[in-house]
């Protein structure tokens, strides 16, 4: 299905929880505890069926930290039939669940790992965890075939300095892609960095442009060790023109854009749910451009993860 601007909606990001076991300095939720508003696995199954009815082909599960949900496996099983089901995670619990996730039908994962420097990692995540926990999770994901594993790195003046070491730590693993993500908004105690800063820190690379989806190409580079590096600029260039996704919040509301306010969806009548989704998609606009002069973090609260 296409919206009024001719963009085909092909994917949905579902935030299954706002709970998190970290309090990352750049996260707009900062580990905030929600009320009892999370949808059940069955309710997610119903919403996903409605998404399939309007032509959505890919599902990305986000949070919060999705692995905190005890019924995550059931949610993944309810996504059967889509072309791709992926998961965004901080990775610290991934080693324990990778096998079950793969068996349930998960195709691949995005894992957040901004640095392998232990002190800096704890400063960024404000947690008791270590980069070693995340690396074990990445290794387990690769072993279970949840590839390509995209390793998300939020760029700051400090994480840029540790990028070469991070690449060295992961160099022996196949099936990885590094994503250099420019942060949205300010980061307390840190100076944001640009993708070009990260590329310079990585040293020699050979540029190759790779079209990753219709309407949209991101710069992709290949390091001398063969690892692909993808540049993600969330609010730059043709972001809105290229957008082919919709979002559903942890409490079952629709967002046509990360920056948009959530809209309610019917809970009881499935036909009405499908009709409402179609109407929301049909009238989807370039919300970022509309709200360019407002607070980024203010527009993002109420979720859905931008990772």
UniProtKB/Swiss-Prot annotation:
Positions of the Radical SAM core domain: 4-222
Details of cofactor binding: Binds 2 [4Fe-4S] clusters. Binds 1 [4Fe-4S] cluster coordinated with 3 cysteines and an exchangeable S-adenosyl-L-methionine and 1 [4Fe-4S] cluster coordinated with 3 cysteines and the GTP-derived substrate.
Cofactor or coenzyme needed: [4Fe-4S] cluster
Residues annotated to bind S-adenosyl-L-methionine: 26, 64, 112
PROSITE patterns: RADICAL_SAM
EC assignment: 4.1.99.22
Ligand binding (GTP): 13, 60, 150, 245-247
Residues that coordinate or bind [4Fe-4S] cluster 2: 240, 243, 257
Keyword GTP-binding included in the entry's annotation: yes
Keyword Manganese: no
Protein name (database record): Probable GTP 3',8-cyclase
Annotated source species: Methanopyrus kandleri (strain AV19 / DSM 6324 / JCM 9639 / NBRC 100938)
Gene (UniProt): moaA
């Amino acid at each position: 299905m296409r919206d009024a601007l001719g963009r085909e909606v092909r994917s949905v990001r579902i935030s299954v929880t706002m709970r998190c076991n970290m309090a990352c300095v750049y996260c707009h939720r900062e580990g905030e505890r929600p009320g009892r508003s999370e949808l059940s696995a069955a309710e997610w199954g119903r919403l996903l069926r409605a998404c399939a009815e309007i032509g959505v082909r890919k599902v990305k599960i986000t949070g919060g930290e999705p692995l905190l949900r005890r019924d995550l496996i059931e949610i993944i099983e309810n996504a059967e039939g889509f072309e791709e089901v992926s998961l965004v995670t901080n990775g610290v619990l991934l080693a324990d669940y990778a096998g079950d996730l793969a068996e349930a039908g998960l195709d691949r994962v995005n894992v957040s790992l901004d640095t392998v420097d232990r002190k800096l990692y704890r400063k960024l995540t404000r947690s008791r965890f270590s980069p070693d926990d995340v690396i074990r999770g990445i290794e387990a994901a690769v072993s279970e075939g949840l590839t390509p594993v995209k390793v998300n790195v939020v760029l700051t003046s400090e994480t840029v300095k540790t990028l070469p070491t991070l690449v060295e730590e992961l160099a022996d693993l196949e099936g990885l892609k590094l994503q250099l993500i420019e942060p949205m908004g300010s980061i307390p105690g840190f100076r944001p960095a640009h993708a070009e800063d990260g590329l310079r820190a990585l040293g020699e690379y050979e540029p190759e442009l790779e079209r990753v989806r219709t309407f949209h190409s991101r710069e992709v580079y290949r390091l001398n060790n063969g690892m692909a590096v993808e540049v993600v600029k969330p609010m730059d260039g043709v972001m809105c023109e290229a957008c082919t996704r919709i979002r559903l919040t942890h409490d079952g509301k629709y967002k046509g854009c990360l920056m948009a306010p959530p809209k309610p969806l019917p809970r009881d009548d499935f036909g009405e749910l499908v009709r409402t989704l179609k109407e929301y998609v049909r009238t989807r606009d370039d919300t970022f451009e509309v709200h360019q002069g407002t607070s980024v973090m203010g527009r993002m609260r109420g979720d859905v993860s931008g990772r």
